Amino acid sequence: VYGMASAYMLTGDDQFLEAAEKGTDYLRDKMRFVDTDTGMIYWYHGQKIGAGGQEQKLLVSEFGDDYDCIPAYEQIYALAGPIQTYRLTGDPRILDDAEKTIDLFDTYFRDKEKGGYYSHIHAVTLSAHDESLGRNKAKKNWNSVGDHAPAYLINLWLATEQDRYKVMLEDTFDTICKHFPDYDNSPFVQEKFFDDWSKDQQWGWQQNRAVVGHNLKIAWNLMRFQAVQP
């Protein structure tokens, strides 16, 4: 969906816009869950289609890294295509989805005391500190903090110029600049952290390895924001 919306921006070809709108409608129809008690929006990990065509919604992740959790990055990237489409259409339904998903981030993923956003929450307790989260308990990482900007947040701010999104951008970038660089030990950023922002260099496959693309994302998005907000 993001690709189709971006292709329309580059070419003006209506078939790309049509695809982006249809893709957004599909995501809203098949992958969105509205909590009627809180008004917040969650996005499903996926859905299974049975032999008879029946649909089974999957809220918790089935990926090994995030198994049986709700990972922040899945909620973050659910907004990527729709928000790029919103920049083109101004569809108020998309903006409403974004606002209610950000409410979810602020309520359950955000660490209001020490800053940043937790990487995973439990699907029932909605706590980042639930023991059943295992190695993902009370953790923060590049995805949960830094991916807001490239996935949807800069585009949402450009589309609306609302202070809420500008403040969130500034906060996430300040958090990245404060905690992620590790120049005394590496030219690459530190990517995974414990609750108190101490380094987690023993997690799963990553250990103390760098992801080069994440470093490029940081530089790219810091400069994007710098260009419009010196």
Q: Where in the sequence are the language-model features?
A:
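Glycan-recognition and catalytic cores of secretory/periplasmic carbohydrate-active enzymes
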Residues: 1-230
